Amino acid sequence: MAQKEEAAAAAEPASQNGEEVENLEDPEKLKELIELPPFEIVTGERLPAHYFKFQFRNVEYSSGRNKTFLCYVVEAQSKGGQVQASRGYLEDEHATNHAEEAFFNSIMPTFDPALRYMVTWYVSSSPCAACADRIVKTLNKTKNLRLLILVGRLFMWEEPEIQAALRKLKEAGCRLRIMKPQDFEYIWQNFVEQEEGESKAFEPWEDIQENFLYYEEKLADILK
């Protein structure tokens, strides 16, 4: 079973983007956190290391992780076999569109209908039901698109609605996988800003392999 958050951690203040929030005993501060205003979708090529370490961690209970981070690789292949690749990341926080929808709204419009596209997403958690529905509709009408989604955690996987949505993704031809430790290392090397004084090598957290196996089993049970 995946590592649960320790009791001490549960007693600590909620965090935003991996940074601790102080003075939560202040009623006004609590109100600010509960009534967060909409944020814009953020795009870029590399995300801060502390975001990655907090948001992508494959824990069972994702307390405080109220964003979706989506790192993407787009490979476009012409009829002649030439391949062009691009990559970047998207993040959301209480935005109108989730990161998955933002990809379709801001990245996909640049696609050339004459090319074939293989898109890989590395997402901090699996899609919600609404985003899964959007993915299914997009795949059904975009015949030159193949999509592989690798997720760090399963979002609300015990909910029947979520389970049904994940099965629909599979039926639509979307390949859905749980991230292995090697996938987290790939993100670290290719999508994370290497801050001054930060170790260049990826340092796996405790139970990363155990948690991968836990989620892999859950996903297999859902998709069978």
Curated annotation (Swiss-Prot):
Binds 1 Zn(2+) ion per subunit. Pfam families: APOBEC2. Residues 1-25 are annotated as: Disordered. Its EC number is 3.5.4.36. Zn(2+) binds at E60, H98, C128, C131. It comes from the Eukaryota. It catalyses: cytidine(6666) in apoB mRNA + H2O + H(+) = uridine(6666) in apoB mRNA + NH4(+). Residues 64-169 form the CMP/dCMP-type deaminase domain. The active site is at E100 (proton donor). Keywords: Hydrolase, Metal-binding, mRNA processing, Zinc. One of its GO terms (cellular component) is cytoplasm. GO terms for biological process: cytidine to uridine editing; mRNA processing; positive regulation of gene expression via chromosomal CpG island demethylation. The keyword Cytoplasm does not apply. GO terms for molecular function: cytidine deaminase activity; metal ion binding; RNA binding. CDD domains: cytidine_deaminase. Its cofactor is Zn(2+). Probable C to U editing enzyme whose physiological substrate is not yet known. Does not display detectable apoB mRNA editing. Has a low intrinsic cytidine deaminase activity. May play a role in the epigenetic regulation of gene expression through the process of active DNA demethylation. Belongs to the cytidine and deoxycytidylate deaminase family. Homotetramer. This is Probable C->U-editing enzyme APOBEC-2. It comes from Bos taurus. The lineage of its organism: Eukaryota, Metazoa, Chordata, Craniata, Vertebrata. The gene is APOBEC2.
